[in-house]
Structures are given as structure tokens and as C-alpha cells.
């Protein structure tokens, strides 16, 4: 696992040769139990590292296409699962908790829904006002730029952009943008989001 911009955040990844990007997962280490976000399957080394940090208490999935290795990790570590409430009726993994817009499942973490993405109520997560975590809707296929999912995969592109603008209005101090697919932005992330949200 790799360290990120905060001492309590780490990531592990898997390279996708077709898209030429990494798929990313996150660990948020907490005294009250670690939280995994959109977890890929663990390599033996990553599992050993995670267990050395206390394992996983919770797994938070931003959308049904980012279930990834959640089921096997939950079974192996006894972690409880959190999913987007808008997908509750058809979510592929049983969840112990459902969250939606404005919820705070853990102190310091605020949930926002991305409307118009490819799945209903996709979650974006804002951590302590300065870091935002996106699952599918916002991504980066090259460094220092952000993009949306291809329009053919979005339900309503303008709704996605409006959701991003709303997040920026509510959290003007965002500086770091972490994505499930592609390059993360560790500086000037708010500016990159503003550029994306202003795109036609």
C-alpha cells in the first residue's frame, strides 16, 4: 500500500492496460476502526499490511460498479458494509448501513450524491473539508486534469456537473481530489474541479 497526502490515508491499485490507468482503493485508518473505500481484491502483501494496521471495520462502496473485492474482504475480516441508499433495492452486496446525501457515517466524513451518473445516487465523500473522494463519475486519464465518465455512460451529464458545483459550494476548501479510476490530484484539486464543473 502507498501513503497519500494525509498520514491516515493509504491506497492500493490495479493497472488497467486498456484504459492505461490505475483503479484505486483507499484505506482510512481510524482509532475506532479502519474504513475501506471501493476496495479492490487484496494481494497477499496488501492484506498483510492492512492486518498490521488493524484490518477493516467498515467497507464503504460508492456505487454498485465499485463493489470490487468488498464481499471477500468483508468475509475475511469481519467488516461491515455501507452502500448508497439510492441503490438499496438492487445492490449486489448485503449492506449493514445505507447512506445518502448529507449523511455523516463517521465523524469528519460527509456524503454527497452525484446525480445523473451511470448508477443512481453514486456517492462522493468529503473528508474534513479538504479532501474529496469520487468513485466513478469523476476520474482522470492523465495527470493534472479531471474528466467525467464518457457521456454515453452518464444518465444526465448536466446533473453530474451541477452535483460537482454543489460540492464545491458547500466545501470551498477542497484541495485534494482522490478518484477510483485514474490519477489523483493532491494540489489545486479544487481548481481542477471548478474547471471540470465549468465545462460545457
Where are these regions (language model features)?
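Pre-active-site segment of Zn-dependent metallo-hydrolases
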Residues: 17-58
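A short, flexible N-terminal coil/short beta segment enriched in small residues
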Residues: 1-14, 56, 67, 77
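Short, charged/polar "capping" segments at the starts of alpha-helices
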Residues: 44-46, 69, 87-92, 185-187
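Active-site metal-binding motif and surrounding structural segment of the metallo-beta-lactamase
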Residues: 41-84
